[in-house]
Curated annotation (Swiss-Prot):
Protein name (Swiss-Prot/TrEMBL): Small ribosomal subunit protein uS4
Source organism (scientific name): Pseudomonas fluorescens (strain ATCC BAA-477 / NRRL B-23932 / Pf-5)
GO biological process, one term: translation
Subunit structure: Part of the 30S ribosomal subunit. Contacts protein S5. The interaction surface between S4 and S5 is involved in control of translational fidelity.
Keywords, in A-Z order: Ribonucleoprotein, Ribosomal protein, RNA-binding, rRNA-binding
Function field: One of the primary rRNA binding proteins, it binds directly to 16S rRNA where it nucleates assembly of the body of the 30S subunit.
Molecular function, one GO term: rRNA binding
Amino acid sequence: MARYIGPKCKLARREGTDLFLKSGVRAIESKCNIEAAPGIHGQRRGRQSDYGTQLREKQKVRRIYGVLERQFSGYYKQAAGKKGATGENLLQLLECRLDNVVYRMGFGSTRAESRQLVSHKSISVNGQTVNVPSYQVRAGDVVAVREKAKNQLRIVQALDLCAQRGRVEWVEVDTEKKSGVFKNVPARSDLSADINESLIVELYSK
C-alpha cells in the first residue's frame, strides 16, 4: 500500500478532526472545513455502526502517526504481546518512533517532514546516523540534527513553531545545539485525550 501524498485537508475532513498533518502556523479550521465530509458538497455524515466507529478511530490514529496499514497491524500485535493495557502499549510504540520523536522535539514542523529528515540521513541517535523512521527510541537516547543539516531553513522554522505551540514534557531539547534527550516513554495521561484506543482494541479483538 502506497503512502498517501494527497491533500491533507481531505484526511482531516474524513476523520472530522485535526490530524496534525499541517504545520500549525494557522488553525486547521481556517484551512479546512473539518466539520464537513470530503467532497465538493461535503455531504452530511451518516450515523455510524459500532464497527464503523471503531474503524474510523483506527484510521484516525494511523493517519496521525503516518503509519501504513500493515505497519499498524504489526504494532498492534506487538502491543498485545506486552504486559499492560494493549491500547496504551500501542500508543507508546507509536510515540517512540524516531520520526515522531523528531517531531516532538521540534526539528520537523510535521510528522511527515520529520520522517523525511530521518530518511535523508539528517538525524542521529546517540551519535549514530539512523535513517529508519520506525526506529524505536528508548528512554535516555540522544536525538540530534546532524551537522550537515543544522542550517536548513525548515529546521530553524520548525523549532520556532514548536516554541510557539509548546514542547511535550518527555523530551528535553537544546535548540542551539539542535539536540535533545528522550527522557522517558510518555504515560497514557500525557497523550491526547481525543484518541480512544479502546475502540481500536475492540476492532482488532473481533
